[in-house]
Each structure stands twice: as structure tokens, then as C-alpha cells.
């Protein structure tokens, strides 16, 4: 949501285990990374075409809907895997990120950027949205508020 996941992927790639394995932030992308589930292409579900009926969507049996491989899930930033981050709500992510101390300058910068990206969601009452929530599951009102959050100078009425 609003670019926050980009910074989280960078934080995951800064861990000692990810550096040891020469992983980039792209590894933690469910859109194109090699860490995504190959069976469902990072969707978390498989589409079954039912000819005369509506298509059926089943949870991917390989990743169980997490979108990532077990190997990608094993990398952790302060005890949270990429899947754990995607399950957090915007409010939970803000709270988690504020509690981390003793970081490098680069980590502090990335955490600051992540909080800055999530802050409009919390301020507009969208703090309950999960970081990995598909956009097609949002209501019309949620989608509209999310769009307003992307405007750089927009201030919500109080």
C-alpha cells in the first residue's frame, strides 16, 4: 500500500542472512521475484475455469495462499518474515516499526519512509487494511480514500 512494501522488501534484503545469500529486494516481490511461489506466480490462488459456470479460485496448495516459497519466508527482519509483514494491518505495521531500536542509518531511513507511506492510511481511518490486501477486495469508499492518500498535498477534513 502506497509504496510501503517497497521499503519493507529493502529492509528484508539488508538482513545478514539475505546479504549472505546475495538477495536483492526483488527476491521478496510476489510480482516478479524468485522468492514468489512458482506454482501460482505469487497470486496465492489458482484459477480453475469451469466452462459454463463462473471460474473457481482455489488457495494454492504449494504456498497455502502466502504467495511466497518456504525459502523466502525463512528470512526475517526483527522476527517478521515477508509473509508476516503482508499480514499486518497498516496500524500494526506502524506500531511494530516504531518499536525497533539500534539500527543503521540506512535502516532508519527506510523505516522513516515506510512510516511516512503508512501514516496517511492511519489518519484516514484505513489503518485496518492489511499491507498485502488485494486492491480488488476494497469497497468503493476505501478505494476512493486510498486514492486520496496518494495525493501529495491533500489534507483530509477534520
Language model: regions and residue ranges:
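Conserved phosphate-binding elements of NTP-dependent enzyme cores
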Residues: 1-158
Amino acid at each position: 500500500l502506497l509504496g510501503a512494501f517497497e521499503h519493507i522488501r529493502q529492509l528484508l534484503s539488508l538482513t545478514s542472512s539475505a546479504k549472505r545469500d546475495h538477495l536483492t529486494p526483488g527476491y521478496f516481490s510476489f510480482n516478479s521475484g524468485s522468492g514468489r511461489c512458482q506454482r501460482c506466480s505469487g497470486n496465492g490462488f489458482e484459477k480453475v475455469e469451469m466452462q459454463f459456470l463462473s471460474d473457481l479460485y482455489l488457495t494454492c496448495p504449494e504456498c497455502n495462499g502466502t504467495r511466497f516459497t518456504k525459502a523466502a519466508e525463512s528470512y526475517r527482519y526483527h522476527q517478521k518474515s515477508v509473509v508476516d509483514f503482508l499480514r499486518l494491518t497498516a496500524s500494526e505495521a506502524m506500531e511494530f516499526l516504531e518499536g525497533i531500536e539500534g539500527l543503521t542509518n540506512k535502516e532508519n531511513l527506510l523505516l522513516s519512509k515506510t512510516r511516512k507511506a503508512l501514516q496517511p492510511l492511519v489518519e484516514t481511518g484505513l489503518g485496518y487494511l492489511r499491507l498485502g490486501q488485494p486492491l480488488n477486495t476494497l469497497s468503493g469508499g476505501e478505494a476512493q480514500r486510498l486514492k486520496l492518500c496518494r495525493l501529495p498535498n491533500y489534507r483530509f477534513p477534520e
